Amino acid sequence: MSALGQSNSLLHFPALQPPRRFLFGPGPTMVHPRVYEALSKPIVGHLDPYFIQVMGDVQQLLKMAFGTGSGTGSGTNDSATLVISGTGSAGMEAAVTNFVEPEAKLAVFANGYFSDRLTEMAKRNGANVVRFEKLWGETFTEDEAREFIRREKPKVVAYIHAETSTGALQSGQAICAAAHDAGALAIADCVTSLGGVPVDFDQTGIDVAYSCTQKGLSCSPGLSPMAISPRAMDWLRARTSPVRSWYFDLKLIYDYSTVSHRYHHTAPISMFYALREALLVIAEEGIENRWERHRRCHKLFVKGIEAMGLRMHVPEEHRIATLNTVCVPKGVDEAKVRRRLLDEAGIEIAGGFGPLAGKVFRIGVMGPLATEDNVQFFLKEFSKALHAEGYSI
């Protein structure tokens, strides 16, 4: 085929027409129409004064979401907020690469897939990793956290605040306090919690937190918000060995976004527009009102699930309000249930993986879908799909 003929054949790709889905999975979630509109705004340069202002707006609004400063985005606290150009895994990599030096001891609270991923990143960075392991879905008590850190004397401690693979919410106050008593930094993975449940960065004593945009913030995927405490910033400035990643060097990124605005990389302009709008939507609702809405819908969801005779995987006191893990009933093929929901109702949910593969459904109720009507809609369709696959309700 000639080059001209090949070129003409490429013109036959159809126009994009994504199917309408109800994103009840662990993420990405539904996006507010204003966020879609923001994505369509004209591009400016990544060094343009207007974009510099947009970055500043995003950093200020993130203070509200993380719970640092006054909690209203006024910027009264010295904690830094910034945004990594990449998904939540980029934020994880940035946290590990910048704050866990080669051969330094990192203590990881391991109870799910994403603590395993963090462990792998740290090992590739040359860290000496020690792990406190529990079954997927379990959490760590205050006494367990203190004893582990006291015994290991690490330089850095890491835990998953909201474990996406299990739906378990880990309290961080005892972990962070014990880390500080040991002279260590505390890193928290807030990928599934930010925007949907309180992170309380300052109150908890977190030093470094990272998240993503496509879950609790109800934005499209592509950015990783971070918050960094003053003591972590001091530690970073005093670091003697070079950060092994140039792209994820937070000193360079912070200088570009906050200080001199010298070129570091070409930021994804449209995604910053989208994140700014998503954060404004949250601010207009009120962050505490948003948390309460998610709590209310979570309770309604659990009530409906239990009325079907189904069981939640995580104990009540440790559940994430935005992400539910429901045990698959005996004799039911969870993959067939998920496929039926997608084909017949346009509903997307996720299955488990790792030790939970085939054993749980992972169902997100977050952002625009966290309303009583939407929860009732989901429960009705979920019940129908289960019944069609042989489950008697």
Predicted regions mapped to residue ranges:
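Conserved active-site segment immediately N-terminal to the catalytic lysine
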Residues: 202-214
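N-terminal "arm"/small-domain region of PLP-dependent enzymes with the aminotransferase-like
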Residues: 2-49
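Conserved PLP-anchoring active-site segment centered on the Schiff-base-forming lysine
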Residues: 100-116
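PLP-dependent enzyme catalytic core of the Aspartate aminotransferase-like
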Residues: 2, 16, 355, 359-393
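Active-site phosphate-binding strand-loop segment of PLP-dependent enzymes
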Residues: 139-195, 208, 216
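Conserved PLP-binding catalytic core of the aspartate aminotransferase-like
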Residues: 311-344
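Active-site C-terminal subdomain of aminotransferase-like
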Residues: 30-31, 214-303, 307
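Conserved N-terminal alpha-helix of the aminotransferase class I/II PLP-enzyme fold
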Residues: 38-94, 113, 117-123
